[in-house]
Design a protein with these regions (language model features):
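Dynamic helix-loop-helix/coil hinge segments at AAA+ ATPase domain boundaries and subdomain interfaces
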Residues: 1-7
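Phosphate-binding P-loop
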Residues: 14-21, 58
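Walker A/P-loop nucleotide-binding motif
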Residues: 21-37
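Post-Walker A helix-loop "phosphate-sensing" segment adjacent to the P-loop in P-loop NTPases
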Residues: 42-53, 60
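Conserved nucleotide-sensing/catalytic segment adjacent to the nucleotide-binding pocket
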Residues: 58-97
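Short regulatory helix/loop adjacent to the ATP-binding pocket of P-loop NTPases
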Residues: 101-116
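Conserved AAA+ ATPase "SRH/arginine-finger" region at the nucleotide-binding site
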Residues: 118-130
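C-terminal helical "lid" of AAA+/P-loop NTPase domains
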Residues: 152-156, 163-177
Length: 200
């Protein structure tokens, strides 16, 4: 789903394996779609998702995805080795985080220089067009077809994030089922305002 807030990031990811240094940082706030885009790249590149305790030698010659680098800090030495392996034939490294690499903490000077030189692509919070597409997708997954007034109401009221869109669709579906009502602007208002109790 392309929109002005993610088109540059999508193009940057699509440029793999031609990334400078065979590595890229995908940066954006929570709920901006980093995980969705990273997983799409992971599948397209047949990458390995890095987890603590993995044997680094098993990752040689493979593209590697490391998510939330700035929140669940990987060992400096492991990250440095992943950078080195990214340059090998068949390798590649995608790192996701909320903060840019220049703000990541490290005590290893060689890793600091790699982070400072890392190509970065940025995601913004979803705009109306992207959030609309996301809402449509989540409603479609539940076989729900709300009217235009529901979309317009939700776009004015919900937090600008993909998890928030998923959660409001879930809550509306549960409320409609519990109350034996169709999904309408009135139901959306009741759910968002908290005036409708889902469970007694």
């Amino acid at each position: 789903m392309l929109s002005p807030t993610n088109v540059d990031a999508v193009r940057a990811l699509d440029a793999w394996p031609e990334w400078p240094g065979h590595a890229l940082a995908l940066i954006g706030p929570e709920g901006s779609g980093k995980t969705h885009l990273a997983q799409a790249w992971d599948q397209a590149a047949d990458a390995v998702v890095f987890e603590r305790g993995m044997e680094l030698s098993a990752l040689e010659g493979r593209p590697v995805l490391v998510e939330d680098v700035d929140r669940r800090r990987a060992r400096d030495e492991a990250l440095f080795h992943l950078f080195n392996m990214a340059g090998l034939k068949g390798g590649g490294l995608l790192l996701t985080a909320r903060k840019p690499p220049v703000q990541w903490k490290t005590d290893l000077p060689d890793l600091r220089s790699r982070l400072n030189a890392l190509t970065v692509t940025q995601l913004g919070a979803p705009d109306d067009a992207l959030l609309r597409k996301v809402l449509e997708k989540f409603f479609r997954e539940r076989s729900i077809r709300p009217g235009e007034e529901v979309y317009q109401y939700l776009l004015r009221r919900i937090e600008r994030s993909i998890p928030a869109a998923r959660e409001v669709v879930r809550r509306l579906d549960e409320a409609a089922d519990e109350q034996q009502r169709g999904i309408s602007r009135v139901l959306a208002r009741e759910v968002l305002d908290g005036t409708l109790e889902l469970f007694e």
